[in-house]
Structures are given as structure tokens and as C-alpha cells.
């Protein structure tokens, strides 16, 4: 658990009085004045309905199973807490977990994809670390893939309203339950959750003291457009279709050609900008397949000549979504943009449809570089992206960071905003080599939960003590045992092997500017 820090105001004086009395009596854990968990059922907060408020006492383990993207519907908790569920306004379902042993911090957690579920995995992670933690379905349930059709209000909830309302009302419930407000608020999310974090930074800078946003992209329509275009090209020329084995062979060929450029042959392209990979060199592809692959893996361009989304990094293992299931990329245009159930993806046009989507659903293009309101509050932002992310182009996050630097200058930007490119990592977590630094979608406990190894601990240290992170030590584990470590460097630095010692030890690596880093 992180150490308690003092906050100002009358609530702080009350807290100090209680702690002082407990110290005199020999008690070891602060006790907060609070109402009972069941009393929260009667909480009177405008536009908030509390449906359940139950005490959870693991004996010794409490398990919850649910269906959600990437296993985020499952949870295991070993600490006692008050589990609150309810609805904000009409459709924004949320849960707030309030630990008995509270560290006076609030953690809002994001979702993934187009949301529609409660992120129980990250709730469990937060409450186990002493945070009062909240998650929302963002105003709809993913059991209905057509949730946006006929409901433009749900799109607004999904984009930004639900995140903001969850933060505002969770803070009210926390203060009511504990008799004291959280002294700091943090947000952590990846993919769709990263988009939510960036919308909080850009639209509601006061909501969170620190935001950790992974693989946020900058354009949800840009992400969906790549998948839609893949299907359109296959419809237009079935002979050009690429199967999963073809995409895998393309990624493997890129790695074979560029792996050793960084001096270490380990299956990782540390500096994709230095890799001059030609898809045509992939064995076994027909000319039609080569052109198809170039259109999908390269910059997403329209007929107007404009690039609407960057290329994927060489080595990223691309895969498409099925045409049925919880999330269907084409619905980003048919349902979201045009509110047309009969929209046919055969008519898809990159320039027209991506532009229309970003205009109709502006919150899914998170490109506002005016972060001064967030900076002036002394709030902090950490973003990260996998070097081999097959969903969100690594370059998209780099381009956004560079755009903020162009606007504010490097010293001012670095005073509150850091980007980390995780070599070898895919989408949000996993991949090749050491990629675990405590990020969501992983929530493993094999790494130390300190600021050197854990992104959330580092954010707390930056916000509350002013010590900014310049690198993390990431780990790779097998059967719960760490088998390799390596630094993750603040952009534009990249990991560099010294040439001596064990390549699997971070002690033999440093963060270095390699000259031709992605810009």
C-alpha cells in the first residue's frame, strides 16, 4: 500500500485528530469516520440511483465471474470492501468498490473497445491496492451490438459524459461513506479506456490529478476504418484476401529482416523507424495480396490524398474482427455516423466516412493539443503504446505527443506529460519480451509495486511528490517467475543494450536517443 499523505482543510484536521488518538491507543491502522455500507442504499445524490450496497468479506478469496472484453469481467479479491452498484441518469451503470483499508485515493478505471461492461478486473486491482475504485458501462451494454442505432445520446455518454459523471458522483459517494473526501484522484485505462482518459484530460481537466492512458489512438474511426477496408478489399477481389497465417508470415518476415538492427536478436524491433521493410519480400504472397497488405498495414489514405491514420509498425501482427460478435467495426459508420441500419460497407470510402464519423462523434477523435488547463492544475499525464500494437498505430500516439510539444515546447510538455513506447508489446499488454509494468489489462502481481516497476505507483510519486518518471523496468514472467527485465524509456529515448552481460537483465540496458527514432 502507498503511504498516506496529508491534505488541507477541515477534513484534514478531523483526520489528523483521529489518527493522533489512535496512535496514543496503540492502534496501527487509521479508522475513518463513516456510515455503514448498507446506508449507501439511501444516499441522496441527484440523478444517481443506488441499487445494491453490500459488504464483501473474502474468506480468504472472493471471486466474481462475468463476460467482458478480454476477460475484464472476472475478479478475485482478498480484501474486505463495500460493493456499490447503481445507475447515473437513465443508463450509465457503474460500480464503486470501497475498501475497508482505504488509502484516501480514488481510482477511476476505463473499459475497452466500445465498452458496454463493468471492468471488474481493474476494480479488483484497484481495491486490492487500497483505492476506492469505480468503473462504468459508459451508458450501454455490449449484449446489444446496435446500441447506438437510434440513440445518439448514448454516443455522447460513450465518448465523454459517462467518464465525467462517474468521477463526479463517485467522489460524492466516497466522501459520504468515509466521512472524508479522497485527497487525490487517478485514472487508468487502455484502448477504449485510454480514449476515455484522454477525453477527461482534454474536456474535464479537474476530474483527475493523474491520468494513465494506454493505446488511446487519437481516432476510433481510424481504427475501425482499417478493419472495414480490409473486408471491402476482400469483397472487391477475393483473390487478394489474406488469412491469419498470411498476416503472421508478414509480421515474422519484418522481424527477421529488422530484428538485429538494434544489436540484439531477440524477436523485437526496438526502433521501427529504422526498419525499411518491404511487404513484397514476404514469401508466398501473390501480387494482389501484396497490394492488399500494403493498403491495410500502410498509412490509411483517402482518395483525396490525405492520410487519415498512420501505418502500423513493422512486426505488428494484424488481425481483423469477425463480422458478428460484441463489436462490429462497420457499425462505427452505419450505426454511429449515419444512423442507418441498411448501410453497406461495400460503399465505404475512407475520406468521406472517416471525416463524417469524426464530425458526428467528435469525442472519438482525441486530438485537442491545448492541454494548458490540465497543466495549470499541476495534473500529470502518462501515455503508453506498444511498439508492435496491431490495433492502434504506435505512430498515432507519437504524432499526438509531438503535436503537444510543437504547441508548448519540450520542457513545458515534459513537466506534465510523458509518453512511453513499449518495445515488443502488442495492444495494451503482452507481446514479445518484457512488457509488464503494472498496466491495466494485465494486473499481474509478479512485478514490484514501486515507482520503478509500476506505472500507477510512478504516477502517484509524480503527482504527490513531484518526481517524474523517465523510465520503467518492465518484466517478463513465466509461471509467476520473472525471466527477463528491460527498461521502458520516455520518448524519444529507446532501450539500448550495452553489449555486455545478460541480455535479459535491465542492468545491462540504458535509455538512449538512437538518432533515427520515430518522429
How would you label these PLM feature ranges?
Residues 1-13:
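N-terminal secretory signal peptides that target proteins for export/translocation
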Residues 32-105, 120-121, 251, 264-269, ...:
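Catalytic-loop region of hydrolases
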Residues 70-72, 112-179, 225-226, 233, ...:
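Cap/lid segment of the alpha/beta-hydrolase catalytic domain
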Residues 189-199:
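Glycine-rich nucleophile elbow surrounding the catalytic serine of serine-hydrolase chemistry
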Residues 275-392, 398, 402-414:
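Substrate-gating cap/lid region and adjacent catalytic-acid/histidine neighborhood
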Residues 16-27:
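Bacterial N-terminal signal peptides
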Residues 199-201, 206-301, 421, 435-451:
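A catalytic-pocket lid/entrance helix-loop region that shapes and gates access to the active site
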Residues 180-191:
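Alpha/beta-hydrolase fold nucleophile elbow
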Amino acid at each position: 500500500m502507498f503511504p498516506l499523505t496529508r491534505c488541507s482543510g477541515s477534513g484534514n484536521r478531523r483526520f489528523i485528530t483521529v489518527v493522533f488518538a489512535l496512535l496514543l491507543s496503540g492502534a496501527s491502522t487509521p479508522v475513518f469516520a463513516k456510515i455503514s455500507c448498507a446506508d449507501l442504499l439511501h444516499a441522496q445524490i441527484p440523478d444517481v440511483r443506488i441499487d445494491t450496497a453490500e459488504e464483501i468479506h473474502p474468506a480468504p478469496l472472493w471471486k466474481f465471474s462475468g463476460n467482458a472484453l478480454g476477460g475484464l469481467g472476472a475478479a478475485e479479491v482478498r480484501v474486505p470492501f463495500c460493493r456499490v452498484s447503481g445507475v447515473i441518469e437513465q443508463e450509465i451503470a457503474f460500480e464503486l468498490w470501497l475498501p475497508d483499508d482505504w488509502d484516501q485515493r480514488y481510482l477511476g478505471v476505463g473499459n475497452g473497445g466500445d465498452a458496454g461492461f463493468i471492468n471488474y478486473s481493474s476494480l479488483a486491482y484497484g481495491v486490492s491496492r487500497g483505492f476506492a475504485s469505480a468503473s462504468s458501462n459508459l451508458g450501454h451494454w455490449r449484449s446489444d451490438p446496435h446500441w447506438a442505432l437510434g440513440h445518439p445520446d448514448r454516443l455522447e455518454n460513450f465518448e465523454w459524459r459517462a467518464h465525467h459523471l462517474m468521477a463526479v458522483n463517485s467522489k460524492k459517494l466516497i466522501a459520504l461513506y468515509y466521512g472524508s473526501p479522497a485527497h487525490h484522484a487517478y485514472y487508468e485505462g487502455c484502448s477504449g479506456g485510454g480514449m476515455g482518459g484522454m477525453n477527461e484530460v482534454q474536456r474535464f481537466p479537474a476530474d483527475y490529478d493523474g491520468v494513465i492512458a494506454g493505446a488511446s489512438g487519437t481516432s476510433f474511426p481510424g481504427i475501425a476504418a482499417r478493419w472495414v477496408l480490409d473486408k471491402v478489399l476482400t469483397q472487391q477481389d477475393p483473390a487478394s484476401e489474406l488469412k491469419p497465417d498470411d498476416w503472421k508470415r508478414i509480421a515474422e518476415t519484418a522481424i527477421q529482416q529488422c530484428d538485429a538492427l538494434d544489436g540484439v536478436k531477440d524477436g523485437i524491433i526496438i526502433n521501427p523507424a529504422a526498419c525499411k521493410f518491404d511487404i513484397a519480400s514476404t514469401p508466398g504472397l501473390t501480387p494482389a495480396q501484396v497490394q492488399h497488405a500494403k493498403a491495410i498495414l500502410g498509412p490509411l489514405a483517402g482518395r483525396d490524398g490525405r492520410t487519415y491514420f498512420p501505418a502500423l509498425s513493422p512486426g505488428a501482427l494484424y488481425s481483423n474482427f469477425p463480422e458478428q460478435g460484441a463489436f462490429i467495426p462497420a457499425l462505427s459508420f452505419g450505426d454511429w455516423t449515419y444512423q442507418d441500419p441498411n448501410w453497406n460497407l461495400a460503399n465505404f470510402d475512407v475520406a468521406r466516412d472517416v471525416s463524417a464519423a469524426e464530425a458526428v462523434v467528435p469525442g472519438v477523435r482525441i486530438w485537442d493539443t491545448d492541454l494548458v488547463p490540465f497543466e495549470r492544475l499541476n495534473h500529470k499525464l502518462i501515455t503508453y503504446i506498444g511498439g508492435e500494437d496491431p490495433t492502434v498505430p504506435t505512430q498515432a500516439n507519437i504524432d499526438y505527443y509531438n503535436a503537444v510539444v510543437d504547441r508548448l515546447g519540450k520542457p513545458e510538455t515534459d513537466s506534465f506529460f510523458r509518453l512511453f513506447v513499449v518495445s515488443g508489446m502488442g495492444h495494451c499488454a503482452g507481446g514479445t519480451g518484457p512488457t509488464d509494468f503494472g498496466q491495466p489489462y494485465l494486473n499481474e502481481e509478479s512485478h514490484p509495486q514501486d515507482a520503478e516497476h509500476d506505472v500507477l505507483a510512478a504516477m502517484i510519486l509524480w503527482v504527490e511528490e513531484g518526481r517524474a518518471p523517465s523510465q520503467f523496468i518492465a518484466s517478463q514472467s513465466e509461471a509467476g517467475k520473472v525471466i527477463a527485465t528491460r527498461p521502458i524509456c520516455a520518448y524519444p529515448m529507446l532501450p539500448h543494450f550495452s553489449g555486455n552481460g545478460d541480455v535479459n537483465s535491465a542492468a545491462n540496458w540504458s535509455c538512449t536517443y538512437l538518432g533515427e527514432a520515430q518522429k
